[in-house]
Amino acid sequence: MGKKSEQSQKVYNEMAWEYDSAPEGRYTRPHKEEIMKKAVLRDGDNILDVACGNGYLLGELSKKAGVNAFGIDISENMIASARERYPACTFAASPCTPLSFENESMDVITVSCAFHHFETPQIFANECMRVLKKNGKVFIAEPFFSPVVRWLANTVVFPFSKTGDVKVYNQKELQLFFESAGFTEIES
């Protein structure tokens, strides 16, 4: 586990039980709700929520259809909170790479407001391609910022922050990770 992943783990372990009322929890809620609107699920689908936090997104998605719901997060305390809140879902403390799932085992993969914490984003995109079934979908909700804000975050703030933030990307950069992994149908 890299330095930034260790920082993320520490920060989210500390806020796990109060996440929904913390600024981070309130900020991420609309992004999660956007995924909930867009994700079309069928009974029997396998869903993986990466960096699932306290399980809110996965728990709500699992109510849309009779799905097999899996969530992973680097924070053990977030996973404990998720298990308590959504006992019908399966949760595990795990990093985002490598994904510990079989090839072509998932119908849907979601990531909400966490991609900027990933130390190896290209490896993550490759792993998504590996574990997704044919015609599977990845939903990523990530905030996009102006070039000036991105530059400040990436060169001034993140190198010195202790929150585990690695890099914020523009939409094209994010798209390129998935194109390089072999994804051909990418919507924004």
PLM features per residue range, with description:
Residues 46, 136-137:
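Short glycine-centered segments of the SAM/dcSAM-binding site in methyltransferase folds
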Residues 122-134:
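A short glycine-rich, Lys/Arg-flanked "PGG" loop and its adjoining helix->strand segment in the class I
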Residues 113-114:
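Short catalytic micro-motifs in class I SAM-dependent methyltransferases
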Residues 110:
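A conserved beta-strand element that flanks and buttresses the S-adenosyl-L-methionine
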Residues 44, 106-107:
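Local beta-strand N-terminus motif with an aromatic residue
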Residues 4, 22-26, 57, 140-181, ...:
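C-terminal alpha-helical "lid/dimerization" subdomain adjacent to the S-adenosyl-L-methionine
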